[in-house]
Amino acid sequence: NPRPRLFRLPADRAIVNRMGFNNDGSAAVAERLARRADREHADVLLGINIGKTKAVPVEDAVEDHRLSTRRLARFADYLVVNVSSPNTPGLRDLQAVEPLRPILAGVRDEAADATGREVPILVKIAPDLADDDIAAVAGLVGELGLAGVVATNTTITRDGLRTDAREVEALGAGGLSGPVLRTRAVEVLRLLRTELDRDRTVISVGGVDSAADVEHRLSLGADLVQAYTAFVYEGPQWPGRVLADLAAGERS
């Protein structure tokens, strides 16, 4: 999407973004990952996110996902199917079970064909889904034998912000992230842990700002925790500080 496309809301430690899936495409990424495979640190776990290309019609979404999977699955320790970005027109419509089923099944099958192994597949969902729809996605994950769910992406709501509403409106469209997302992200985590079998993975993301947030998500059944907005505000040493705080908590 055209710039400007990323905005800070300092009063809320939040971000509004309408980045879109701006990248060089799966073919170029595959070339870079092939070079990485021969380098130091190639043993670091690598999760690869894929999503529908903006220019691809919704009716061609299955094949578009299969193409990305065909090119990238061999490099992935796990794959995430992102159908929840608010910045690609029509993408969130693919979260409904009927259009989502062939996409996820196609990615699963393509990954197995391309690698000769079972690549863990997760689906990334929006916080704006109704609880019934979240439960339906969880059911689909079980039905297709997928690894789990990443919850959640950014929200299109603007509720609970300290920043003046006129200032927020002037920024335009985009997904909102940061601490304001925490309450809903926790609600979705609780719901997924109820709906999914315990051997399915839940990666919790949204409003994670501290070691206490990480500990809380893990206590509610998250298997992994992700963060982004706090990284932007706190800088590249922030993850290390969180890990140090977690380790100190374990020692105490």
Regions found by a protein language model. Name each.
Residues N1-A42:
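A gly/proline- and charged-residue-enriched helix-loop-helix capping module
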Residues N1-D12, D159-G174, T229-S252:
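C-terminal helical cap(s) of enzyme catalytic domains, especially alpha/beta-barrels
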Residues V29, V81-N82, K124, V149, ...:
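Conserved, mostly hydrophobic/aromatic
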Residues H41-I48, D113-L129, T194-S204:
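Short beta-strand/loop segments at the ligand-binding rim of alpha/beta enzyme cores
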Residues T53-R66, R92-Q95, P99, L122-E143:
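Active-site glycine- and acidic-residue-rich loops that bind
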Residues E63, L129-E143, R193-R198, V208-V225:
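Catalytic cores of alpha/beta
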Residues P86-P99, L140-R198, Q237-W238, V242:
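Glycine/Thr-rich beta-alpha phosphate-binding loop at enzyme active sites
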Residues G148-R158, G207-V208, V214-R241:
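Glycine-rich phosphate-binding active-site loops on the catalytic face of alpha/beta enzymes
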